[in-house]
C-alpha cells in the first residue's frame, strides 16, 4: 500500500519531519534572504574577533535616549540568560531590534547597539530578533558554533590551532587540527561520557533552543509562544533521559537528582574552556563543594520557591499575581508549571514562585567563588552555551523533572479509551538497516567530522582551519510497521516512535512505570491508512526530533532556509551508544488518530525539522496530545504487554557499538 507522508498541513509537514517543498514555501521565505544573510554575517563577524583600527564608532547617529539603560553588563564578560540581573538589558535590546519597520533600519540600529553592549548579550538578542522578525524569514540565525568556537572546543585544541596559525603554514591547503587526540584522563569519572557531554551539536542545540524560546519573551514582542512551558519541561526531560541512557550504555548508574543544596556536589568538573579574545576562563569545580549563598540570593530563598511550587502542585492550583487560583489539573497545567519552574516572564506569579531553575544555574556557576572574593569567573553552568557540558546539569535537571513528575502523578493514568485508536491494529514492528542484511540490530560507531573555523579569530589570524572532532553515529535504519485498518474507510494516523533501555544498572528489567522515565522520543510522523493491510516504512533520517548533520557541520550557505533556527537534537545522536556486546533496547510504536490530534491546517516552512523538541516556530505546536504521550503519566500496569492497546506495539532491538572510526565526509 502507498503510505505517503501527508504534507498538506502544518501538523502533517512538521510531524513527518519533512519540510514543505520550496515552491509552497516561497511566499513565506523572503526573496533576498541570501543578501540579508551576508549583512547579518558581516554584523556578527567581529563579536568574538579583534576589532581592527578601521572600526568607526556610530555615536551620535540616533537619539541617544533610545539607548538609555544599555551597557549595564560589562563587555568581555559572559552573558547568562539564567542570570535575571541581565534580563532587563537583554529584553530592551530585543525590543529595540524588533521595532524597526524595514530590514535596512534593523541592520543600521543593530550596528549601533553592537558596540554599546556586551558582545555575548548582543549575539543572543540579535539571534532572537532574527528568529522572530518577519523580514528575516529564511535568514539563518547566527550559529553559536561559528561565533564562539572556543565555547565548544577545549583550550588545548584552541592552543594547537594557535600554534599552527603562528607558524603561518597555510600555503595552498587549509590545515586540519586533530581534536580527537586530546589526552585522556582516566581519573575523571566522566571521561567515558565526554563524547556526549562535549558534543558540539548537542550543546549547540541547547543554546539555540533557548534562542527560539527565550525566557524573556512576552506576547508584546510578537505573539504567544504556544506551549512554551511544556516544551521547557519536555525537551529538558528528554536530555536527562538521553544522558541516563548513555550512562547505562557505559555501565554507569543513572544520575542522581541534586535536591538538597546543603549536601556536597558529587560531580567535580573542569570545563577546559577559555574565550581566547577576552581570556575569560570558565571556572573549575572540585568534587564535594557545597553551594553557598550569593550576595543577593540566599539558599533559603531557593527552598522557599521550591516549597511554594510543591504546595501548588499538591493543591492542584497556583496563585496568580492578582491572587486568583489557577488550576493545574488539566491539559494546560504542565504548560503553566513549566513557565513557573523555568521561570520565564510568562510565569503566573514570578514574585511569589521566584526563579528556581535559572537561579540554580547561577548559584551553581558561582559555587567556587560565590562572593567574588578572588575574582574568579563563572563555571560552565552559568552559560546556556556551555551548561550542558557539566554533569551537574543533568543532576539538577533531574531534580527539576521530579517536580514536574509530582504534577504528573496527580493526573489519572490514561484509560483504554484514551489510548486506543478504534479499528486500527499494529501487527508488527521491525527495525531494518539500509542494506537489509539483519533485523532488529543497529550498529553504532565513532564518526570523525570536520568543523571549519573562519579566519580572523585571535587563534586563526592567518587563515581558516578545519578541526577534526569525534562524535557518535549510527547506521541508517528504517522502522517497518504492518498496520491493519479494520474500518471501511481511510483513516489518518500519527505514528509515535519511542525507545528505552530494558535493564537497569544491575541488569534487572524495569517495570514499565520506571522505564517510562528513560523513554526517549525517536520520531513522530503521519500516515494514510487504507482499509485492510498497510505497510509503513519510515527512515531514521526524517526524525521529528533531530536536526540534520549539516546544521552543525555544513557551511551556512549550504543550509536550506527552512532550517534556519539551528534547533534540534543532532541526527547522529538519535540512538544511544550501546555496548560492544549489545544494549537491549525496546522500541515502541503507537498509532493515534490524526484527525483528533491535529491542531490546524496551516503549513510550516521555517524551523520545522525538529518540531517534537523545538516546536513549530511562531505557530501552534502541531499536536494536541501531551508531549511524551502515552508515557507522560503514571502507568499502573507492570509490563507493556498489560498496558498496550491494539494500536500499540513494542519490539526489542540490540544496539551494538563497534568501536570503529569512520573518516570525515568529503576530502580533507
UniProtKB/Swiss-Prot annotation:
<feature type="binding site">
    <location>
        <position position="210"/>
    </location>
    <ligand>
        <name>Cu cation A</name>
    </ligand>
</feature>
<dbReference type="InterPro" id="IPR036697">
    <property type="entry name" value="Hemocyanin_N_sf"/>
</dbReference>
<keyword id="KW-1015">Disulfide bond</keyword>
<keyword id="KW-0561">Oxygen transport</keyword>
<comment type="similarity">
    <text>Belongs to the tyrosinase family. Hemocyanin subfamily.</text>
</comment>
<comment type="function">
    <text>Hemocyanins are copper-containing oxygen carriers occurring freely dissolved in the hemolymph of many mollusks and arthropods.</text>
</comment>
<keyword id="KW-0732">Signal</keyword>
<feature type="binding site">
    <location>
        <position position="397"/>
    </location>
    <ligand>
        <name>Cu cation B</name>
    </ligand>
</feature>
<dbReference type="InterPro" id="IPR000896">
    <property type="entry name" value="Hemocyanin/hexamerin_mid_dom"/>
</dbReference>
<feature type="signal peptide">
    <location>
        <begin position="1"/>
        <end position="22"/>
    </location>
</feature>
<keyword id="KW-0813">Transport</keyword>
<dbReference type="InterPro" id="IPR005203">
    <property type="entry name" value="Hemocyanin_C"/>
</dbReference>
<keyword id="KW-0964">Secreted</keyword>
<feature type="disulfide bond">
    <location>
        <begin position="567"/>
        <end position="614"/>
    </location>
</feature>
<dbReference type="InterPro" id="IPR002227">
    <property type="entry name" value="Tyrosinase_Cu-bd"/>
</dbReference>
<protein>
    <recommendedName>
        <fullName>Hemocyanin subunit D</fullName>
    </recommendedName>
</protein>
<dbReference type="GO" id="GO:0005344">
    <property type="term" value="F:oxygen carrier activity"/>
</dbReference>
<feature type="binding site">
    <location>
        <position position="206"/>
    </location>
    <ligand>
        <name>Cu cation A</name>
    </ligand>
</feature>
<dbReference type="Pfam" id="PF03723">
    <property type="entry name" value="Hemocyanin_C"/>
</dbReference>
<dbReference type="InterPro" id="IPR014756">
    <property type="entry name" value="Ig_E-set"/>
</dbReference>
<feature type="binding site">
    <location>
        <position position="357"/>
    </location>
    <ligand>
        <name>Cu cation B</name>
    </ligand>
</feature>
<dbReference type="InterPro" id="IPR013788">
    <property type="entry name" value="Hemocyanin/hexamerin"/>
</dbReference>
<dbReference type="Pfam" id="PF03722">
    <property type="entry name" value="Hemocyanin_N"/>
</dbReference>
<comment type="subunit">
    <text>36-chain polymer consisting of 6 hexamers, each of which includes 4 different chains, A, B, C and D.</text>
</comment>
<dbReference type="GO" id="GO:0046872">
    <property type="term" value="F:metal ion binding"/>
</dbReference>
<feature type="binding site">
    <location>
        <position position="361"/>
    </location>
    <ligand>
        <name>Cu cation B</name>
    </ligand>
</feature>
<keyword id="KW-0186">Copper</keyword>
<dbReference type="GO" id="GO:0005576">
    <property type="term" value="C:extracellular region"/>
</dbReference>
<keyword id="KW-0479">Metal-binding</keyword>
<keyword id="KW-0325">Glycoprotein</keyword>
<dbReference type="InterPro" id="IPR008922">
    <property type="entry name" value="Di-copper_centre_dom_sf"/>
</dbReference>
<dbReference type="GO" id="GO:0016491">
    <property type="term" value="F:oxidoreductase activity"/>
</dbReference>
<dbReference type="Pfam" id="PF00372">
    <property type="entry name" value="Hemocyanin_M"/>
</dbReference>
<feature type="glycosylation site" description="N-linked (GlcNAc...) asparagine">
    <location>
        <position position="322"/>
    </location>
</feature>
<dbReference type="InterPro" id="IPR037020">
    <property type="entry name" value="Hemocyanin_C_sf"/>
</dbReference>
<feature type="binding site">
    <location>
        <position position="236"/>
    </location>
    <ligand>
        <name>Cu cation A</name>
    </ligand>
</feature>
<dbReference type="InterPro" id="IPR005204">
    <property type="entry name" value="Hemocyanin_N"/>
</dbReference>
Amino acid at each position: 500500500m502507498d503510505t505517503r507522508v501527508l504534507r498538506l498541513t502544518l501538523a502533517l509537514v512538521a510531524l513527518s519531519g519533512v519540510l514543505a517543498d520550496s515552491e509552497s514555501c516561497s511566499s513565506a521565505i523572503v526573496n533576498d534572504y541570501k543578501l540579508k544573510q551576508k549583512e547579518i554575517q558581516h554584523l556578527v563577524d567581529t563579536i568574538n574577533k579583534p576589532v581592527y583600527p578601521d572600526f568607526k564608532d556610530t555615536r551620535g547617529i540616533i537619539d541617544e535616549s533610545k539607548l538609555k539603560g544599555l551597557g549595564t553588563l560589562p563587555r568581555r564578560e559572559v552573558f547568562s540568560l539564567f542570570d535575571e540581573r541581565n534580563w532587563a538589558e537583554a529584553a530592551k535590546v530585543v525590543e529595540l531590534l524588533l521595532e524597526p519597520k524595514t530590514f535596512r533600519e534593523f541592520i543600521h540600529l543593530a550596528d549601533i547597539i553592537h558596540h554599546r553592549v556586551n558582545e555575548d548579550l548582543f549575539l543572543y538578542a540579535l539571534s532572537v530578533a532574527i528568529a522572530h522578525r518577519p523580514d528575516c524569514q529564511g535568514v539563518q540565525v547566527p550559529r553559536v558554533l561559528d561565533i564562539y568556537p572556543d565555547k565548544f572546543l577545549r583550550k588545548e585544541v584552541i592552543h594547537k590551532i594557535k600554534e599552527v596559525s603562528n607558524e603561518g603554514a597555510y600555503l595552498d591547503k587549509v590545515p586540519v587540527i586533530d581534536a580527537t587526540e586530546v589526552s585522556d584522563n582516566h581519573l575523571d569519572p566522566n571521561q567515558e561520557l565526554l563524547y556526549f557531554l562535549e558534543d558540539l551539536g548537542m550543546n549547540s542545540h541547547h543554546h539555540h533552543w533557548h534562542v527560539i524560546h527565550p525566557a524573556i519573551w512576552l506576547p508584546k514582542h510578537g505573539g504567544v509562544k504556544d506551549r512554551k512551558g511544556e516544551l521547557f519541561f519536555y525537551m529538558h526531560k528528554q536530555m536527562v533521559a538521553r544522558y541516563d541512557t548513555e550512562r547505562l550504555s557505559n555501565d554507569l548508574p543513572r544520575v542522581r537528582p541534586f535536591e538538597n543544596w546543603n549536601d556536597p556536589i558529587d560531580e567535580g568538573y573542569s570545563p577546559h574552556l577559555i574565550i581566547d579574545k577576552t581570556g575569560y576562563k570558565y571556572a573549575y569545580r572540585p568534587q564535594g563543594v557545597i553551594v553557598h549563598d550569593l550576595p543577593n540570593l540566599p539558599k533559603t530563598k531557593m527552598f522557599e520557591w521550591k516549597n511554594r511550587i510543591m504546595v501548588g502542585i499538591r493543591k492542584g492550583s497556583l496563585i496568580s499575581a492578582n491572587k486568583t487560583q489557577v488550576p493545574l489539573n488539566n491539559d494546560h497545567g504542565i504548560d503553566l508549571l513549566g513557565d513557573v519552574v523555568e521561570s520565564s516572564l510568562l510565569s503566573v506569579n514570578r514574585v511569589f514562585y521566584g526563579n528556581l531553575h535559572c537561579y540554580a544555574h547561577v548559584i551553581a556557576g558561582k559555587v567556587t567563588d560565590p562572593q567574588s572574593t578572588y575574582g574568579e569567573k563563572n563555571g560552565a553552568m552559568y552559560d546556556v552555551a556551555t551548561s550542558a557540558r557539566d554533569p551537574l546539569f543533568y543532576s539538577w535537571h533531574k531534580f527539576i523533572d521530579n517536580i514536574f513528575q509530582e504534577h504528573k502523578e496527580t493526573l489519572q493514568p490514561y484509560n483504554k479509551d484514551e489510548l486506543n485508536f478504534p479499528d486500527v491494529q499494529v501487527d508488527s514492528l521491525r527495525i531494518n538497516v539500509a542494506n537489509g542484511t539483519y533485523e532488529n540490530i543497529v550498529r553504532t560507531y565513532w564518526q570523525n567530522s570536520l568543523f571549519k573555523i573562519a579566519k580572523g579569530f585571535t587563534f586563526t589570524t592567518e587563515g581558516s582551519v578545519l578541526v577534526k572532532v569525534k562524535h557518535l553515529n549510527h547506521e541508517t535504519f528504517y522502522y517497518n510497521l504492518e498496520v491493519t485498518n479494520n474500518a471501511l474507510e481511510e483513516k489518518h494516523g500519527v505514528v509515535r516512535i519511542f525507545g528505552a533501555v530494558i535493564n537497569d544498572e544491575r541488569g534487572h528489567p524495569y517495570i514499565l512505570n520506571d522505564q517510562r522515565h528513560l523513554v526517549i522520543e525517536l520520531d513522530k510522523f503521519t500516515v494514510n491508512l487504507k482499509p485492510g493491510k498497510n505497510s509503513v516504512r519510515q527512515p531514521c533520517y526524517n526524525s521529528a526530533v533531530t536536526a540534520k548533520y549539516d546544521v552543525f557541520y555544513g557551511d551556512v550557505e549550504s543550509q536550506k532556509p527552512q532550517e534556519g533556527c539551528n534547533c534540534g537534537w543532532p541526527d547522529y545522536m538519535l540512538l544511544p551508544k550501546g555496548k560492544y556486546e549489545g544494549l537491549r533496547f525496546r522500541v515502541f510504536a503507537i498509532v493515534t488518530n490524526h484527525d483528533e490530534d491535529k491542531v490546524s491546517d496551516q503549513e510550516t516552512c521555517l524551523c520545522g525539522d525538529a518540531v517534537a523538541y523545538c516546536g513549530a516556530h511562531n505557530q501552534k505546536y502541531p499536536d494536541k496530545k501531551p508531549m511524551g504521550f502515552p508515557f507522560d503519566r503514571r502507568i499502573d500496569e507492570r509490563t507493556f504487554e498489560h498496558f498496550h492497546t491494539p494500536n500499540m506495539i513494542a519490539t526489542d532491538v540490540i544496539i551494538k557499538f563497534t568501536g570503529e572510526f569512520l573518516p570525515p565526509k568529503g576530502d580533507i
